[in-house]
Amino acid sequence: MRFAGNGLTCQSCHLQAGTQQYGLPLAGVWGVFPQYIGRENEVRTLQERVNGCMERSMNGRALPVDGPEMKAIVTYVRYISEAQQVGRSLEGRGAPPLPLPARAADPERGREVFASTCASCHGEDGQGQRLEAAEAAEQGKRYQFPPLWGPDSYNDGAGMARTITAARFVHANMPVVSPGVV
């Protein structure tokens, strides 16, 4: 059964299978949950946080908390967190701070940067690069490079829909071949 409602996978945001520093890593996350989540103004479990991603970033449905898919995700997060100290947040968790510019955003300059730096992977229209059906089935994903907006991307409730979150992530991780250029 498919729970994601779009063409993204966990690795669309959590780079290198959730192990890349500043690539929204999941390594170490096991030891910081349960955790207060400001959006909900409540302490939430890791399973609840995963379902938040499923519903917003993946634009889909919540996983059954004790179902095989949730157990697999939680087991993987625990496995990649084993070397980390419980209760201690890791260096490189999230994306690094980015100073806010002292000027207004410039959409025309943004268009130029996108065309010269982003479009080669994400497409001129930002809809990503789809894989052929056989390759997609083999790799377990629909896209070589994910769409950045539209129906096969995250929804407006996702963290990446926040301009500062997206800017910090892009600045630290894009383009993939030369992070930090953008």
Model-predicted segments: where are they?
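Short amphipathic alpha-helical interaction patches enriched in hydrophobic/aromatic residues
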Residues: 54-58, 152, 174, 178
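C-terminal capping alpha-helices of c-type cytochrome domains
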Residues: 49-89, 181-182
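The canonical Cys-X-X-Cys-His
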Residues: 7-18, 73, 110-126, 182
